[in-house]
């Protein structure tokens, strides 16, 4: 059996597709598994042993820029993909996505699997598009993204796993080693600090500077742990990913000695190297929070206004050492006591873990 799985979305979405790959490999060890990803999220699967081939297509739109050459490259790749004569093409993801359905239908697979049906963004023409699927599954908005992905394997004769299947990510050793060098330069020992992150697309999900200062002070006085502040570099109006420089600039020069700023370069894997050495981490809901959830220290993810934003039921960290807090409107509403209780829970978990998700953890 030859299977291709499409994942169009961002980094966190790709990480949450890894349990699907692991479960498929275990259930059908002889299957040939291909993954089709874009040039924004494909790196999450580098080194993943559960796929036989990773196809990467360039996005036509990158932030505010259009890349006409990407159209030509996608057409060339489509011709090569159709020659593979896949038995199944699956549009991974826990939502109804007409764009994903349209893309897998172009692949010429014998059977096509995706969620179909009601979606507030669907156009009237989408019903005809969904009708072309050989295996259109009804959308269940109560499931977590991981569970929704696993459910897409049922047309292949693969039942849902009995035990939880967790995401896995192989952070390359050079990033871990580079982070260790930076920590040494700051006089911070591995496992003796907590990461506080600002990275989020929406301001309502970010902790305030006052919260960051209070939390780091508590971690130092009560736990004897330093803190490392990580933020997204760049301007707030960046079309690829909004930056946090304007938030950090007013107080970066007056940080206390126990709060170290990590001037994260463009590649998020540099920040992940630091996270891999942390006792635990706090991040706003988003892709980096999911990556941090599979690090040795785990993560506390901060959610806000989930009546209009992704809900923890669908999007919480799906890992043994992942937990979350949910604020009515903004993360600034969260009490310090609630944050400290969650951090204590994470620190009570074992500080060293060996992941068994089918990919290397180092």
Q: Where are each of the predicted segments found?
A:
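Catalytic machinery of carbohydrate-active enzymes
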Residues: 1-362
């Amino acid at each position: 059996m030859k299977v291709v799985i499409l994942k169009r979305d961002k980094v966190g979405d790709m990480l949450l597709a890894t349990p699907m790959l692991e479960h498929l490999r275990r259930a059908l060890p002889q299957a040939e598994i291909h993954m089709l990803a874009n040039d924004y999220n494909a790196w999450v699967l580098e080194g993943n042993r559960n796929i036989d081939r990773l196809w990467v297509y360039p996005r036509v739109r990158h932030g505010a820029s259009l890349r006409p050459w990407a159209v030509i490259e996608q057409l060339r790749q489509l011709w090569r993909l159709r020659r593979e004569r896949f038995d199944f093409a699956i549009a991974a993801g826990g939502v109804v996505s007409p764009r994903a359905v349209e893309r897998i239908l172009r692949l010429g697979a014998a059977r096509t699997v995706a969620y179909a049906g009601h979606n507030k963004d669907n156009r009237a023409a989408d019903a005809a598009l969904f009708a072309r699927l050989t295996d259109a599954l009804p959308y269940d908005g109560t499931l977590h993204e991981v569970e929704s992905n696993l459910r897409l394997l049922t047309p292949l004769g693969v039942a849902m796993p009995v035990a939880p299947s967790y995401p896995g990510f192989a952070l390359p050793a050079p990033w871990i080693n580079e982070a260790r060098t930076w920590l040494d330069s700051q006089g911070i020992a591995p496992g003796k600090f907590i990461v506080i992150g600002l990275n989020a697309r929406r301001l309502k999900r970010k902790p305030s500077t006052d919260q960051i200062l209070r939390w780091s002070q508590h971690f130092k006085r009560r736990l004897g742990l330093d803190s490392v502040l990580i933020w997204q570099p760049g301007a707030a109006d960046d079309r690829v990913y909004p930056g946090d420089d304007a938030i950090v600039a007013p107080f970066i020069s007056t940080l206390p000695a126990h709060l170290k700023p990590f001037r994260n370069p463009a590649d998020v894997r540099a920040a992940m190297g630091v996270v891999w050495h942390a006792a635990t981490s706090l991040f706003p809901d988003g892709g980096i929070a999911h990556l941090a959830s599979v690090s040795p220290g785990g993560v506390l993810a901060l959610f806000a206004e989930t009546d209009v934003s992704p809900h923890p039921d669908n999007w919480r960290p799906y890992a043994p050492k992942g937990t979350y807090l949910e604020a009515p409107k903004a993360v600034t509403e969260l009490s310090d006591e609630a944050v400290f209780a969650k951090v204590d829970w994470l620190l009570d978990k074992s500080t060293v873990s060996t992941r068994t998700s089918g990919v290397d953890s180092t």
